Amino acid sequence: RIIFELLKNSKISDRSLSKKLGVSQPTVTRRRMMLERTSIDNYTLVPKWDQLGYEIFAINFVKIKMEIATGEKDKSVRDRGIKWLMKQPNIIMAGASRGMGMDAFNISLHKSYADYDQWFGAFRSEMGDLVDDIQSVLVNLRGGEVIKPLNFKYISEGAT
């Protein structure tokens, strides 16, 4: 229950959380510290992306060339891909995936379509020799059509 309450509001004090859960403040502090060692990766905020100047939220799907993704080259290709991904500050999540004939995905944020287009061109230029196909879904963060903004509080609402 502590994690779900922290998903709703990670700024809540242990004292307020203890009152909400009906346990002592030292118990909450002890359990939270244990959860921070085992289950909580970090505390993060979810900003209003458009207010920070971001216009595009992109979900990018990648199909790796079959001959590259198998055999001896697999580790070096994977290492090269990971190194490239980690240098991209606008990519907020990436990993392997299954479905739609794609092998990997990444989620990126961009200040404008021109920024996205430049990033996409750099991706094709730097990683294109490893990729068969790239497909992107672009979400306009300023268009007024984001119905349910990204927020982790929804997970806690579904669990309680």
PLM region descriptions:
Residues R1-T160:
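A compositional/biophysical signature of low hydrophobicity enriched in polar/charged and small residues
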